[in-house]
């Protein structure tokens, strides 16, 4: 199997984590897996053998989907991609974000094997995607089967590309987040002040840190000793009582989730899935999330969510939801959230992806026999 990621694997990101997680699952299932992406391998690469990884070159930051995407551009990166495709006669090529002008699009153009493409984007209205769908119709036609990580992502594929995709959610190594034998506050004393945790890129407005900070005055009136921890890339000036940790390693992130009293996901737009919400659910920390459809779906629906949902962009609603979550603590909702999270373990999601592979390979085989 050949897996292609358009973004640098050594830069934290949801798509990158999915490629590495899927590669680990496929290797565990006995498949020979090769990975192509810009940049280098991260320290935690889910056991991927460096000999099975090829870089298309150094990544540069390009604005895309409200974020800064670390991609490799230019003729040299494209030539490296074409050489990799030619050198690895894979049974199936799986490209992620196939229309991003990086390794995925170049690999799609050079593909001779059956192709599965995963779409992660949740941009509701995108002139760039519409133009890409028209200008790159030939490349899109090379895709044998499309996967969307959520109904939201599937709608984007239908609207902009005029084709359908099967929904297969993102996967997670749930066991890495579950620590039933650990202190639920990860060593913090019983009398420690309540801790609120935000994970995400501090400089991206769609991640909603501004909404959380706007809610702080109301939260401090109700909880004067509240501690707010912000972890993730990007520098940001924070008010007193807030602590910025910057980018943290995966193991430290898991420890932070276990140590928090409430995890807050105040995102405002363009989220196709919400992997940080899933990580919090698996960790057993109470979740407060904006009412974006993917977040509500992860939490089991808006009617009786396994967490607290608030109206996106509304600081007062966020503060009220956090106060309720702090008063409830860990209990029925967090146990239900953990149970829901197990549905997204790679042991469940991985076989669904492999099932798509099997259908594509069977169709190609039937075409060859006819």
Task: List each model region and its residues.
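N-terminal strand-loop element at the rim of the active site
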Residues: 5-12, 20, 24-75
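A charged, aromatic-enriched C-terminal amphipathic alpha-helix characteristic of glycosyltransferases
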Residues: 29, 182, 331-357
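Carbohydrate-associated surface elements
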Residues: 39, 152, 171
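Membrane-proximal helix-turn-helix segments that form the acceptor-binding/catalytic region
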Residues: 123, 128-146, 159-160
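Acidic anion/phosphate-binding donor-loop and adjacent secondary structure
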Residues: 130, 155-158, 172-192
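Short hydrophobic beta-strand element within catalytic cores of glycosyltransferases
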Residues: 286-289
């Amino acid at each position: 199997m050949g897996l292609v990621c358009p973004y640098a694997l050594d830069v934290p990101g949801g798509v990158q984590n999915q490629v590495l997680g899927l590669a680990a699952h496929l290797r565990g299932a006995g498949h020979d897996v090769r990975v192509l992406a810009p940049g280098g391998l991260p320290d935690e690469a889910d056991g991927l053998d460096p000999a099975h990884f090829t870089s298309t070159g150094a990544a540069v930051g390009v604005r895309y989907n409200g974020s800064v995407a670390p991609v490799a551009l230019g003729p040299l990166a494209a030539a490296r991609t074409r050489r990799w495709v030619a050198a690895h006669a894979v049974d199936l090529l799986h490209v992620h974000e196939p229309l991003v002008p990086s390794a995925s699009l170049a690999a799609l153009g050079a593909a001779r094997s059956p192709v599965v493409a995963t779409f992660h984007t949740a941009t509701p209205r995108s002139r760039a995607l519409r133009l890409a769908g028209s200008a790159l119709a030939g490349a899109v036609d090379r895709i044998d089967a499309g996967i969307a990580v959520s109904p939201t992502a599937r709608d984007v594929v239908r609207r902009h590309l005029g084709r359908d995709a099967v929904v297969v959610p993102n996967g997670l190594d749930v066991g890495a987040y579950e620590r039933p034998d650990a202190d639920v506050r990860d060593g913090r004393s019983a009398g420690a002040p309540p801790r609120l945790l935000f994970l995400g890129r501090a400089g991206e407005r769609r991640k909603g840190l501004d909404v959380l900070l706007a809610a702080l005055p109301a939260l401090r009136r109700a909880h004067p000793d509240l501690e707010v921890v912000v972890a993730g890339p990007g520098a940001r000036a924070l008010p007193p009582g807030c602590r910025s940790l910057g980018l943290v390693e995966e193991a430290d992130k898991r420890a932070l989730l276990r140590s928090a009293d409430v995890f807050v996901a105040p995102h405002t737009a363009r989220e196709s899935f919400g992997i940080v919400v899933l990580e919090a659910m698996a960790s057993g920390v109470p979740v407060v999330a904006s009412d974006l459809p993917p977040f509500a779906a992860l939490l089991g629906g808006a009617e009786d969510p396994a967490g607290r949902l608030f109206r996106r962009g509304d600081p007062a609603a966020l503060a009220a939801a956090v106060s309720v979550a702090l008063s409830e603590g860990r209990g029925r909702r967090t146990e239900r959230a953990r149970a829901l999270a197990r549905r997204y373990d790679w042991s469940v999601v991985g076989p669904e992806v492999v099932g798509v592979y099997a259908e594509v390979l069977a169709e190609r085989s039937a075409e060859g026999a006819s």
